[in-house]
């Protein structure tokens, strides 16, 4: 059983991907109706493996407590630049019982390829650009250390999946929809700020490949940042949400991923990677 916590499109995608991989998966939402519209296209069958709990009913709270206790694995995936609070971390990872395997989405923290141009592009072009400000880098580092210590204390393992600027997450245009990897519904594009929609949709059609990088070695866009911020092709510093979700979920089944960290970067491709291509990428970094 998998429990997924976080926020935003990458969180929903990770949960949908886990369910599609055959894991009974639980998430909690205060906005169940919107979540369902983002998760499932109108003509798409809902996956019985994915359970969305509300937060209002007593039975939801009971079901959530049961989901925490029965979880084998925990996925932590925040779209926004934030981490779990200490209180919530204690709730989803109790000292006794609960998940012993954790896949956590973090960021590239090395500072390579960052700097004033990247920071400027976040302000001017795309507020979702990852520009590695020192206080956020410290926040992620401190959370990773806390998470690893907590999981190690109960004999478990953490895999850290590092991303940069998160892009895409939907099915692409209607002509190019694929079923190899789960995506969010077309409604995803309606939720994006108007001037960001077109290149996100193009990204979901053109940049379906993935390249994994060992440890914390991936670089940001550097001087190119102003051009990469809203680019739909494969550029340094970017990570596709669909590929990040795949990496999080696939790492759970890989013994070699326990205790490891790696980065997810982009690669031009009209097709989502096959199982064989994923195996080859993991072999490079684990």
What kind of feature is each model-predicted range?
Residues 55-57:
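Short beta->alpha junction loops
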């Amino acid at each position: 059983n998998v429990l997924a916590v976080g926020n935003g499109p990458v969180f929903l995608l990770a949960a949908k991907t886990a369910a599609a991989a055959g894991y009974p998966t639980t998430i909690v939402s205060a906005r169940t109706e919107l979540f369902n519209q983002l998760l499932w296209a109108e003509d798409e069958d809902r996956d019985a493996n994915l359970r969305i709990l509300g937060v209002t009913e007593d039975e939801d709270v009971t079901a959530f407590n049961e989901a925490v206790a029965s979880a084998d694995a925990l996925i932590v995936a925040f779209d926004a630049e934030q981490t779990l609070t200490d209180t919530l971390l204690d709730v989803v990872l109790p000292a006794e019982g609960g998940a012993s395997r954790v896949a956590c989405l973090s960021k590239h923290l090395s500072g390579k390829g960052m700097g004033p141009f990247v920071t400027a592009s976040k302000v001017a072009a795309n507020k979702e650009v990852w520009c590695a400000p020192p206080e956020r880098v410290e926040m992620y580092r401190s959370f990773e250390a806390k998470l690893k210590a907590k999981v190690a204390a109960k004999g478990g393992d953490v895999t850290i999946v590092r991303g940069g600027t998160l892009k895409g997450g939907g099915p692409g245009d209607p002509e190019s929809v694929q079923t190899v990897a789960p995506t969010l519904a077309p409604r995803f594009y309606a939720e994006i700020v108007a001037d960001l929609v077109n290149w996100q949709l193009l990204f979901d059609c053109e940049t379906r490949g993935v390249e994994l990088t060992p440890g914390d070695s991936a670089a940001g866009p550097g001087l190119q940042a102003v051009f990469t911020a809203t680019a739909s092709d494969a550029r340094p510093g970017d990570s596709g949400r669909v590929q990040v979700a795949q990496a999080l979920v696939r790492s759970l089944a890989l013994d070699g991923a326990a205790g490891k960290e790696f980065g997810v970067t982009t690669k031009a491709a009209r097709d989502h990677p096959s199982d064989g291509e994923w195996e080859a990428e993991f072999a490079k970094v684990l």
